[in-house]
Each structure stands twice: as structure tokens, then as C-alpha cells.
UniProtKB/Swiss-Prot annotation:
This is Large ribosomal subunit protein uL16. CDD domains: Ribosomal_L16_L10e (cd01433). The keyword rRNA-binding applies. GO terms for biological process: translation. The lineage of its organism: Bacteria, Pseudomonadati, Pseudomonadota, Gammaproteobacteria, Vibrionales. It comes from Aliivibrio salmonicida (strain LFI1238). The gene is rplP. It holds the Pfam family Ribosomal_L16.
Length: 136
């Protein structure tokens, strides 16, 4: 599972997920999976989508993951009264804005990449679209 090796602070405030994304172009591979909606991806969701793609292309080609879960999410245990401080870190998320290219793929035919990204998109909680590299 993806998570930072070390952080400056253990816990962060919730905050908001506004604005537009950086990393909106396909830069490493030939094809990409781009976010249309906004939301947050857990490390488990990122890994599940990666596995779905890898299995479908039968480990040919190359896959890049362009998102990293760097925000800790805390939860208090069940049946615990409110107060007594912030809960423990339970999982890590990556905040996704519209336009962010989340995964890229290279070295496979377009139809195979399309199907692999479709399977991966089923594992993710946000709407996505298939994009190709723009050649100038």
C-alpha cells in the first residue's frame, strides 16, 4: 500500500478539495486515465485499480501511477464518546481535482489499454475518461 515514509506532522486538518489539477497532460506513456470529477482516492483504491490494469494487460507494457496518497485520514474507534482528542490515522488518501491524469500506460495496443482503464475505473469512486498523448 502507498503511504509516505515520514511526514512533518502526524495528523492534518480536513480542509477542502477545491481548484483545478496540476498534471493534466499525458507525459510518460501513450494513454492515460483522466479524472472528470473531484474526490479522494484511498491507497487501497489506487492499488486495486493498478492490479486490475496489470492483470488485464498480462504484465506487458508499462504503467505509471501519477497520484500518491499523502493525506492522513483519522477516525475514532466505535462506541467512543466525542472529545478526548483527535482519532488515530486509519488510512491515507490522494485528493483528486478534475483534469488530473491518474494512470498512464505505454507499450500496448489502444483497445487493450482502453479495456484495462475501463476495468480500473470501476474500482475508483470518481468519474474518469480515457485520453491519449497529444502530438504537436
Amino acid at each position: 500500500m502507498l503511504q509516505p515514509k515520514r511526514t512533518k506532522f502526524r495528523k492534518v486538518m480536513t480542509g477542502r478539495n477545491r481548484g483545478l489539477a496540476k498534471g493534466t497532460e499525458v507525459s510518460f506513456g501513450e494513454f492515460g486515465l483522466k479524472a472528470v470529477g473531484r474526490g479522494r482516492l484511498t491507497a487501497r483504491q489506487i492499488e486495486a485499480a493498478r492490479r486490475a490494469m496489470t492483470r488485464h494487460v498480462k504484465r506487458q507494457g508499462q504503467i505509471w501511477i501519477r497520484v500518491f496518497p499523502d493525506k492522513p485520514i483519522t477516525e475514532k474507534p466505535l462506541e467512543v464518546r466525542q472529545g478526548k482528542g483527535k482519532g488515530n490515522v486509519e488510512y491515507w488518501v490522494a485528493q483528486i481535482q478534475p483534469g488530473k491524469v491518474m494512470y498512464e500506460m505505454n507499450g500496448v495496443p489502444e483497445e487493450l489499454a482502453r479495456e484495462a482503464f475501463r476495468l480500473a475505473a470501476r474500482k475508483l469512486p470518481i468519474k474518469t475518461t480515457f485520453v491519449t498523448k497529444q502530438v504537436m
